[in-house]
């Protein structure tokens, strides 16, 4: 047992809470998959190392310890003085290794929200979170009082403010805001949908094939609109701080991202899964077989995504690295920049011309030529070609049947929101009803003001300190393609730099391009 992770509500600040959550995340991280931290693979964890304790106190006098299972980041038990209490569904080994020397009791409910809410006679929406709620939870559990209803309610507070906050950047951020402003809050529909879909999102990322999830994950926006997440490059994936371990991607042993060796019995994701999806790209248009013509050599174009899923915009991502519509292959005519991309019979085409890798960053590359799929024309119906990879916006793609832009506000330094002002962009107090703070995130990696989706966030130059402004999307430049990363940065692939609030001073009214430092003025969050 290394040092106990501690948090006290006495004199707590958003900073002290942030440090607590970061320490907890660090202790729970077992590796990286697709560059996202993941809990340890249960097959690699010995039972005696399966649990960690977190000490929560609200003063010198009152503290409790919470036992957390490292394989799912879940609260399984707590200790109050010389007594310890275990949730009904706690693993058998929990009572062996957690809180030795205490008198152990079993609680009458398990750790699922359904059961906790039934015993609490309240739903999560009705239970306030924040410092006051946590202070009370610690006092109540420490008192050893036998009121089951109140026990369940206080555990709902602790689970969300510790476990859920460790799993999601947006939940830890929300708690941080409530500490900073001294106000309690109830979980909104977006937060609840994230809590309910943690295993689905984790599985989607780990089982993704060529960027596509095996199943859609349906989240909710704050105003109860469905948010469909069906691809690794969907910007919402960046709110994950920690994933549940589901399985290792089949090619993980070649992946430099995995920091632990694969053991024999470790679960490998199925490689049999071959998703059929749309491929959205420039200006949200879809990869389309021109005029439904499947004769060899017919060109592939960018066309507006149809209201219904239709065959000539549907592509099966095969495990042999071909991408097929109606059984025929997406094929490059040659290996020189500017060669056009066509539909072709898979068996008679040159094999290397039909192979494509879809990278996590939205690049679709033909390995033989090292050229990438590109929509050079901004007009509908333009022929797709292969070009030298420059991470241009017109070379950005996202797979999935839901190719419509994802509309969100973007909060950053000091919990202020990104706001469009003419051709400029800066930070202002967040206001859900302000159109100037709504951003449409397109499949091509562009970030567009909802007020005018012909305008894209663009870095003026390719150099450190360059201001970020709104410019015409019709350019399709590299300076208009952005990646939302799990470290909180909004990243320019071409420049290898990130969006940065100049000088950590919002009053300068400038967001600039700057090398990544990880400081708070480079950390952003989609609030959908």
Swiss-Prot record:
Cystine pairings recorded for this chain: 247-269, 286-305, 329-346, 417-430, 456-473
Residue windows of the 1-alpha repeats: 283-325
Spans of repeat 2-beta: 453-492
SUPFAM superfamilies: Ribosome inactivating proteins (RIP), Ricin B-like lectins
Pfam families registered for this protein in UniProt: Ricin_B_lectin, RIP
1-gamma repeat segments: 369-401
EC number(s) stated in the UniProt entry for this protein: 3.2.2.22
Superkingdom per UniProt: Eukaryota
Sugar attachment sites: 200, 361, 401
2-gamma repeats mapped onto the chain: 495-528
Residues with Pyrrolidone carboxylic acid modification: 1
GO MF terms, alphabetically ordered: carbohydrate binding; rRNA N-glycosylase activity; toxin activity
Active-site feature positions: 164
2-alpha repeats: 414-449
Annotated InterPro entries: Ribosome-inact_prot_sf, Ribosome_inactivat_1/2, Ribosome_inactivat_prot, Ribosome_inactivat_prot_CS, Ribosome_inactivat_prot_sub1, Ribosome_inactivat_prot_sub2, Ricin_B-like_lectins, Ricin_B_lectin
Keyword terms: Disulfide bond, Glycoprotein, Hydrolase, Lectin, Plant defense, Protein synthesis inhibitor, Pyrrolidone carboxylic acid, Repeat, Toxin
Keyword Transcription set for record: no
Biological process terms in GO annotation: defense response; negative regulation of translation
Subunit structure: Disulfide-linked dimer of A and B chains.
Protein family membership: In the N-terminal section; belongs to the ribosome-inactivating protein family. Type 2 RIP subfamily.
Biological role: The A chain is responsible for inhibiting protein synthesis through the catalytic inactivation of 60S ribosomal subunits by removing adenine from position 4,324 of 28S rRNA. The B chain is a galactose-specific lectin that facilitates the binding of abrin to the cell membrane that precedes endocytosis.
Protein name listed in UniProt: Abrin-d
Organism: Abrus precatorius
